[in-house]
Amino acid sequence: SSDVCSSDLPFVGGHEIVGSVAAVGEGVSEREFPIGRKLTARLIQVCGKCYFCRHGEENLCVDINAPFDKEMEIPGTGGLGEYLNIDPSQAYLLPESLSDTAAVFSEPLACVLNSIERGQIALGDDVAVLGGGIMGMLHVLCAKLSGARVIMSEPDAERRALAKTLGCDDTINPMETNPVDYIKNLNGIGAEAVFNTTPISAVAKQAVEMTAPLGRCVMYSSQHPDKPIEISPNWLHSSETVITGAVSPSVRSFQRAVNMLSKGLIDPEKLVSGVYPCNQAQEAFEAAIRPDTFRIIITF
């Protein structure tokens, strides 16, 4: 249990956002950011000075987990509000033709593109996606664009059906079929790229086991609880399998996400379960925590 300390508040959450330019500050040109222009923002607060920031990997910034935004002096990034103060370096302009419901996927898509890049999908690869939540579905969309045959492992029948409508070539119910055996039997070696989007350590172990020699296994999701899995060093040595992680969006992947959405290369609107005005925020949060919903959007 926890109490609520005065230092916890105010807190304005929300980091998957879309809005429009209301005003520009000193030193910012309206020619670059016209008033009323639609935009999204990468709201991860980074130091800009550490080794990773200087090498274009801002998602690994040493300060990224700082609990307070020192500049604004309040915790939280502020997307769940009418106004938000952002640095110009965080802003990405969007075409007016892009719907708000698609534009809010800029940040999660950017996270997934970072993961896809880590997976190094080649044309004709077999790709396994473990988990059929929002992030699993976005992995399906991106893997298909990369020219792969995509198989999803997901126990929920409705989510498996949705994955098929998004282009997934095959789906597995892991409660009925051993996903490791199924993937290996497809081509005799396993999947060249595996993306674990679930927080379950047993599934993380399956992800490693179904990865082909020379393949890439990407741990996209954090694990809860953070329970170690056993891996044979000799197997890793002889298979040359790569096990890696993917966390948050980089500047590079965020720009790519904006480009893909703006050009209509990715259509995430099937992943929106509901749109609520801000005066129905309570109903929105109650809908968001149900297991049968995907993204819930609150408008201001």
Q: Where in the sequence are the language-model features?
A:
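Residues in the short beta-alpha loop(s) of Rossmann-like NAD(P)-binding domains
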Residues: 156, 223, 249
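NAD(P)H dinucleotide-binding glycine-rich loop of Rossmann-like/cofactor-binding domains
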Residues: 47-130
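Mid-domain Rossmann-like dinucleotide-binding core that forms the NAD(H)/NADP(H) cofactor-binding site
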Residues: 36, 95-176, 181
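Glycine-rich beta-strand-centered segment in the early N-terminal region that forms part
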Residues: 5-54, 95-97
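Residue-level marker of beta-strand positions
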Residues: 16, 37-38, 52, 83, ...
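C-terminal hydrophobic helical "lid"/dimerization subdomain
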Residues: 205-209, 250-300
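Glycine-rich cofactor phosphate-binding loops and adjacent beta1-alpha1 units
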Residues: 119, 161, 166-242
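Short, well-ordered loop/turn sites that connect or cap secondary structure elements
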Residues: 31-34, 121, 211
